């Protein structure tokens, strides 16, 4: 995208996402203003890890955000806000099956697909959009249920944080089958 537009990733994110959706505390590069609210991560043993101060934007791993900001983004993702209807449909339409490169097929595979930029999962609560993040001592997960107008966002500052996801899904959305968590652990 940088090559096509001549703009940096940070500039594109600010112009197309952060400003339009009111994400005032989000950036792909470190800002000193984040110092007051940033949390240290914790490794598998529970020991604090340093906070990374990325000076260059990396789309896959350098996003700094708050739960409030990221939830605003999730609501736009869930509804397709700011997108043409045809583009918004791409966020809910399987584009490819979730194949694991070099890994054997799993029981969860038939229930997981990829749309444009987001995972799709069949759940007992309906079709869900989902994604996860893993920055070592920080783990993240989100799931939206567009049919129920609900979303769950989980940020943790622990290398063990992903162990909470299934239990939190069951508590928040209710008992049921959430194939995304099984897919992640297989």
Give each language-model segment a name.
Residues 3-41, 45, 80-82:
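Active-site helix/loop module of the DD-peptidase/beta-lactamase fold
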Residues 14-15, 19, 45, 50-186:
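Catalytic loop of the DD-peptidase/beta-lactamase superfamily, centered on the K-T-G motif
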